[in-house]
Structures are given as structure tokens and as C-alpha cells.
Amino acid sequence: MKITYPSIDKLLSRVNSRYSLSVLAAKRAHEIQAGAPLALKHYKSDKAVGEALEEIAAGKVTIDPEHREDIG
């Protein structure tokens, strides 16, 4: 999959690594699919992952460094 919008450079300016970006986008996309409120009024993408990436690029979704999840 090739990301054309938002640009990967803009996305990586919001997070510290590609891994963090992929995890954040996947988690936010899952929330969107589960019915969470959207953070933007308008989206260019019609898919949850694209919407999540647009929210990250806009600075509406960030990583909470204090949040820890149980692995198993």
C-alpha cells in the first residue's frame, strides 16, 4: 500500500517512528470502525485507516506516553 495523502513526512513529524505510526493508525482505525466520534469535520479518505492517518497528520490523535497495555 502506498500512502499519498497525508504525506509520510508529515505523518512522521507527528510520531517518532514508522512502527509507532502504524500502531497508532491501526488502533485509531479500529476505534473509528467501532463507532468512536470522528476528530475532523471533513476527510479525503472514505476508509477508517485513511481517516485515522488524516487525524494523525492534523495533530488530533497522538500517542499517550503514559498509557500501558497488558500484553497477555
From Swiss-Prot:
Q: Show the GO cellular component annotation of the record.
A: DNA-directed RNA polymerase complex
Entry's family note: Belongs to the RNA polymerase subunit omega family.
* Enzyme Commission numbers on file: 2.7.7.6
Organism from which the protein derives: Lactobacillus johnsonii (strain CNCM I-12250 / La1 / NCC 533)
Alphabetic keyword roster:
DNA-directed RNA polymerase, Nucleotidyltransferase, Transcription, Transferase
Mind telling me what this protein is named? Answer: DNA-directed RNA polymerase subunit omega
What's the name of its gene? Answer: rpoZ
* Phylogenetic lineage: Bacteria, Bacillati, Bacillota, Bacilli, Lactobacillales
Under the heading InterPro entries, the entry gives:
DNA-dir_RNA_pol_omega (IPR003716), Pol_omega/Rpo6/RPB6 (IPR006110), RPB6/omega-like_sf (IPR036161)
Write down the PANTHER family for this protein, in alphabetical order. DNA-DIRECTED RNA POLYMERASE SUBUNIT OMEGA
* Its biological purpose: Promotes RNA polymerase assembly. Latches the N- and C-terminal regions of the beta' subunit thereby facilitating its interaction with the beta and alpha subunits.
